[in-house]
Amino acid sequence: MGKASGLLLFLLGFGFFVVTYNLLTLIVHNRSGVSNSDGSPLLDPVVQMPLNIRKAKSSPAPFHVALTATDAPYNKWQCRIMYYWYKQKKALPGSDMGGFTRILHSGNSDNLMDEIPTFVVDPLPPGLDRGYVVLNRPWAFVQWLERATIKEDYVLMAEPDHVFVNPLPNLAVGGFPAAFPFFYITPEKYENIVRKYYPAEMGPVTNIDPIGNSPVIISKESLEKIAPTWMNVSLTMKNDPETDKAFGWVLEMYGYAIASAIHGVRHILRKDFMLQPPWDLSTKGKFIIHYTYGCDYNMKGELTYGKIGEWRFDKRSHLRGPPPRNMSLPPPGVPESVVTLVKMVNEATATIPNWDTL
């Protein structure tokens, strides 16, 4: 377990070569984490997760908060809210948050450079993402890790639509990264597909954690090894019609999970890492609000998911520009998680300068 086979190197390398030789060369240069032709591993030995991992204390080491983004208005307003709440929670007791970087993979600077710490990287070559813009995420991290100066030894991979609802400690324990488990990431269900990228000789499919790359707190050292493989696997999967059809919009999440398993990296699964309204009803004991789902309710406070509600908050309603300041609060009976989310968005938009014009 943890040793990438020569067969895997051939399959991934050849698939990626078909896509773009230059990018493959760069990834190999950045230690893609597969074996040499003689079978010798380019990976660190696998460290088994200790039995007493649940009793271990969180690492006090600070972590760098990093998220990838485009220069689209939809991404910009989310990043501004996210950065606002990062600043509010960073200095509070219980927080291990260090620096912050918006990794901008548009290839050019934008008008948020002076507001949010930003590192500009190149997008994938035209057409390579095949309309699936999320494929730029692993490539962005590869470039950032290679070129940026990162003081912290740990990194939190976050997203623009994350809001820090409580101070976030370093949840990584004993060198093991921490991740949020997603119910829809089910490697065992797709074993016949997963085996194309994680062959049987590498270990059971259960070695692949039910996660994506975000939210994840991981050591910089581990991420430097995983990121090129994550990109390699994701691009190869996108170019395989069977895999692309099976995984759809979560393909890149499977890419990260499989790449981690290739490197023998297991994650501590933390359900308290994140909540997702409207399905999660309370923010108590949680750290991040992920507002990926629309919140639709009638005026009785009843959820009308799948149908536009009399009251709603859905980030997709604001694709071309930011939501207005002072949005109306949900009606009585709506879960605390949704109420808190709207209040936090309202506070951020009321405080951030030039909210409506930037």
Swiss-Prot record:
Record keyword Membrane present: yes
UniProt main location, coarse: Golgi
Coiled-coil residue windows: none
Highest taxon, organism lineage: Eukaryota
UniProt note: phenotype after gene disruption: No visible phenotype, but reduced level of arabinosylation of EXT3. Short-root-hair phenotype. Hpat1 hpat3 double mutants have an impaired growth of pollen tubes, thereby causing a transmisson defect through the male gametophyte. Hpat1 hpat2 hpat3 triple mutants fail to produce detectable levels of Hyp-arabinosides, have low fertility and shorter pollen tubes.
Tissues expressing the protein: Ubiquitous.
Subcellular location: Golgi apparatus, cis-Golgi network membrane
Any one GO molecular-function label of the UniProt entry: hydroxyproline O-arabinosyltransferase activity
Catalytic activity of the protein: trans-4-hydroxy-L-prolyl-[protein] + UDP-beta-L-arabinofuranose = O-(beta-L-arabinofuranosyl)-trans-4-hydroxy-L-prolyl-[protein] + UDP + H(+)
Catalytic class of the enzyme: transferase
Protein EC: 2.4.2.58
Membrane topology: Single-pass type II membrane protein
Residues passing through the membrane, by range: 8-28
GO CC terms, sorted: endosome; Golgi apparatus; Golgi trans cisterna; membrane; trans-Golgi network
Keywords for the protein's UniProt record, in alphabetical order: Glycosyltransferase, Golgi apparatus, Membrane, Signal-anchor, Transferase, Transmembrane, Transmembrane helix
Keyword Transmembrane tagged: yes
Function, in words: Glycosyltransferase involved in the O-arabinosylation of several proteins including extensins and small signaling peptides. Catalyzes the transfer of the initial L-arabinose to the hydroxyl group of Hyp residues. Contributes redundantly with HPAT1 and HPAT2 to arabinosylation of EXT3, but main contributor to arabinosylation of CLE peptides.
Name of this protein: Hydroxyproline O-arabinosyltransferase 3
Organism for this UniProt entry: Arabidopsis thaliana (Mouse-ear cress)
Underlying gene: HPAT3
